[in-house]
């Protein structure tokens, strides 16, 4: 009997969109069946355009399984897509189709996003990425997340309503703080 090869699984902690060296990180804990998360996803897209080069975004899973029966599998599907570098394509697809997130639909969305893993559906059925979703959920709980969408700007909980204007103000404040921290270091070299 041959031992299975171990495969390194890419977690959501390692999946960002935006400049990897950006001074501000916007992290969201969300649920693919949540209407509020779907709406705020459009806000995040606008923020990424406005703060191009200054902002990177990380989406973390916080499925509200008591009210959203497909949220867990949708999160797992996004991680399955992430293994082939298709997380963001799947992320957008899941929000666009948030009312149809059954396993067969998830497999079709994955194909539409360019995922070629023939075991994609099998991985969903076997919860191959379930532990990773649970890891995000537990981290969210540790950080005080109780509902979605929940945002963190440079690891600080954002407490306002997640509108474009409010998040923009939070990001601008983080950029100002970053500049203040940078100035003393450059003066010390002079």
Could you say what each language-model-derived stretch is?
Residues 19-21, 29, 69, 146:
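A generic fold-level signal
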Residues 1-6:
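N-proximal helix/coil linker or "cap" segments that precede and/or mark the start of modular domains
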Residues 7-24:
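A short beta-strand-turn-helix
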Residues 27-28, 32-112, 116, 172, ...:
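Structural alpha/beta surface segment adjacent to cysteine/selenocysteine redox centers
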Residues 29-30, 36-46, 108-190:
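C-terminal cap of thioredoxin/glutaredoxin-like
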């Amino acid at each position: 009997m041959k031992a299975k090869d171990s495969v390194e699984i890419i977690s959501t902690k390692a999946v960002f969109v935006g400049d990897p060296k950006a001074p501000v990180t916007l992290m969201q804990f969300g649920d693919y069946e949540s209407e509020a998360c779907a709406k705020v996803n459009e806000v995040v897209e606008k923020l990424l355009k406005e703060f191009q080069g200054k902002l990177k975004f990380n989406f973390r899973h916080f499925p509200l399984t008591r009210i959203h029966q497909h949220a867990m599998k949708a999160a797992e599907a996004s991680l399955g897509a992430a293994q082939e570098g298709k997380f963001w394509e799947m992320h957008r697809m899941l929000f666009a189709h948030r009312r149809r997130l059954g396993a067969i639909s998830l497999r079709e969305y994955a194909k539409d996003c360019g995922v070629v893993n023939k075991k994609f559906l099998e991985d969903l059925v076997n919860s191959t990425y379930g532990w990773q979703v649970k890891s995000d959920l537990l981290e969210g709980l540790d950080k005080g997340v109780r509902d979605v969408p929940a945002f963190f700007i440079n690891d600080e909980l954002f407490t306002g309503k997640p509108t474009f204007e409010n998040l923009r103000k939070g990001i601008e404040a983080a950029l100002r703080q970053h500049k203040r921290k940078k100035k003393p270091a450059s003066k010390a070299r002079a």
